[in-house]
Regions:
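Conserved catalytic motifs of ABC-family nucleotide-binding domains
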Residues: 166
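Helix-to-loop junction immediately C-terminal to a conserved catalytic motif
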Residues: 58
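The feature captures the beta-strand-to-loop junction immediately N-terminal to the Walker
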Residues: 43-45
Length: 272
């Protein structure tokens, strides 16, 4: 297991984390660190604890022992007000979107603003419309309901909602799952732009090797309850660890892909 040392630029620090459900051990002695303004991927087989670790980082579940610090705050020390304040500083895009079917897109994106701010309805709608433009959807999409959107559009809409509060930190759960190759490539580009233009720190769970090769600065491979290795995809592809090699087997992964160049910073992405 690779253990990282403390860094002043760390946005997330996890130390000696252990989690169990009854007799089933999910994590034991997990250590990892996510650096500011990097795209960090969590990989591993089914049951390796990726989703549980994500839930612990976003305060949906508590580990049995160990520490998690997010944006400089020890998650064990939070009261209700501090929890609410910290949650305002990150956004989450869940695997299945989590859009409310009874609300149109503009209303869905505006929900975090209604929950966490005292802004008036007109300003909330204006911000939501800007987020729609930001993630590359047409303005009239705001009046549509989730059932009227394609899978790729729903992913973008979920991402727009995660960005509603202008977070410093973004969590993505399987952002390309269920998408066709063209839509998945669009998500790749979008993730890069969010980091490069806005300086977001991005943590993602993914099984998509193409996404990891294209956008991840570093990847942590989980297995047997712990972190098997952390490094760039190039570094991981050269390791002999069987728990890591499984991600580089098969026809699709036999030839390592070169990291795709960062997309050009289009003027529409420049902060106003």
């Amino acid at each position: 297991m690779q253990t990282e040392t403390h860094s002043d630029t760390a946005v997330i620090e996890i130390r000696d984390l252990s989690t169990r459900f009854g007799d089933h051990i999910v994590h034991t002695g997990v250590d990892l660190e996510v650096r500011r303004a990097e795209i960090f991927a969590l990989a591993g087989g089914s049951g390796s604890g990726k989703s549980t670790l994500l839930r612990e980082m976003i305060l949906l579940q508590r580990p049995d022992s160990g520490t998690i610090r997010v944006l400089g705050t020890d998650l064990r020390t939070l009261d209700e007000d501090a929890t609410r304040a910290l949650r305002r500083r990150w956004g989450v895009m869940f695997q299945h979107g989590g859009l409310f079917s009874s609300l149109n897109l503009l209303e869905n994106i505006g929900l975090p603003l209604r929950e966490h701010t005292a802004l008036d309805a007109a300003l909330i709608d204006e911000i939501a419309a800007w987020k729609i433009a930001l993630i590359g959807l047409a303005p009239d999409t705001g009046a549509q309901f989730p059932a009227e959107l394609s899978g790729g559009m729903q992913k973008r809409a979920s991402l727009a909602r995660a960005l509603a509060l202008d977070p410093e930190l973004l969590f993505l759960d399987e952002p390309t799952a269920g998408l066709d190759p063209a839509s998945a490539a669009d998500v790749d580009e979008l993730v890069c732009k969010l980091r490069d233009v806005f300086g977001l720190t991005i943590v993602m769970i993914t099984h998509d090797l193409n996404l990891m090769w294209r956008v991840a600065d570093r990847v942590a491979v989980l297995g047997a309850g712990t972190v098997q290795a952390i490094g760039s995809m190039d570094e991981l592809s050269r390791l002999g660890n069987p728990a890591v090699r499984v991600f580089f087997e098969g026809r699709r992964a036999q030839v390592p892909r070169e990291r795709a160049p960062r997309p050009a910073m289009e003027s529409a992405w420049k902060p106003k």
